[in-house]
Amino acid sequence: MSQSLITRRKSFLLRIIPVMLCFFAMGFVDLVGTASNYVQQDLGLTDAQANLFPSLVFFWFLIFSVPTGMLMNKIGRKNTVLISLVVTAVSLFIPTFGDSYLIMLASFSLLGIGNAIMQTSLNPLITNLISSDRLASTLTFGQFVKAIASFLAPIIAAWGATTLLPVFGLGWRVLFVIYAVISLLAISLLAATSIEEDRPVAASSIGQCLKQLGRPFILLSFLGIMCHVGIDVGTNTTAPKIIIERLGLPLEDAGFATGIYFIFRTIGCFLGAFILRAISPKLFFAISVLMMLVGMSLLALCDTLAPLYTGIGLIGFGNSNIFSVIFSQALVYASDKKNEVSGLMIMGLFGGTVFPLAMGYAADAVGQIGAVAVMTVGVLYLLYYTLKIKKI
């Protein structure tokens, strides 16, 4: 191996590692499902009230995603990611002051704003390091790193709630402090990393960004992202409630259902990074959606632990690569408008607001079977989207 090749690989690793740590920080938003269940228990909230937390987090994706695409055109993708990390760190320190309803609303709002900015800017930043034929697999690996943070959240929260070690009286909220410190580390490493960016010829207006939705495939992809994140947040939040409703387990035990989901989502992201280099995105997407459909059927029909865990695992694995395939398809389809399309795709994460709200009302009306029915609608749409996927 030549010295120049070794130098290039070393340079690439020095740039990609800080970016992957940012993907880990991106996963902090998934603590909202775990946190909302603990807050619901602490404050005695209804399902509809508790589901306001994840809905509030993802509401900000609707507001901030497109303006972030415009901000990237002005200050660059890396600087925009740094801003998002600062906002995220601030949001994670807020719960150290208490767990009242207003404090948690403020924390989740800032967490949503920071994550909206981060997801809009970090995903296209990868295109400055990776060629288009490796984009889907690299984004999937980033989602794998993100999923590790998601998987650890319920474990850290449960440890904080039950440990005899001193956690400054925070209990399960020690989760926020640990993730805040990691956010500060990500800020330091990314700020010290040099990344060359391709600058746009001209800045875009909000109208020009939204105009991209007039392109049929971009609109279909936008709706696909909405369904993906709705299923993701919905399963994250609802899985423990299904266990509690049907088996009567306490939250500390039922919360393992969220861990099952993220274990399989993490495994799916890791394997997907390699599978997407071997088979077409369309075939892998179809297999993933069918796995979710089977998983939803198990959640709807079963009332014992093993099949419920199986269904949750199938949904986690199936949903693990949906985002990466849709996002990469959209970026390659509109390669001349990457920042704008990125903003629109991340705006689709607003589905994380729509789905939990609908699921909360459905669950209050007919039980958790109503929440499962709402998520199944999203899975059926993704089955339709499979037919529209292009070959890259």
Region spans (language model):
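Cytoplasmic helix-loop-helix junction between adjacent transmembrane helices
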Residues: 107-144
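Conserved MFS/SLC helix-loop-helix module at the cytosolic interface between two early adjacent transmembrane helices
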Residues: 63-102
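Central cavity-lining transmembrane alpha-helices of secondary-active solute carriers
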Residues: 52-70, 259-271
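Extracytoplasmic gate region of multi-pass secondary transporters
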Residues: 32-33, 214-259, 263-269
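Extracytoplasmic
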Residues: 14-45, 123, 235-240
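Intracellular juxtamembrane helix-capping segments at the cytosolic ends
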Residues: 117-131, 320-335
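Helix-loop-helix hairpin linking two adjacent transmembrane segments in secondary transporters
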Residues: 133, 137-194
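Helix-breaking motifs and short loop linkers at transmembrane-helix boundaries and internal kinks
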Residues: 44, 76, 97-102, 248, ...
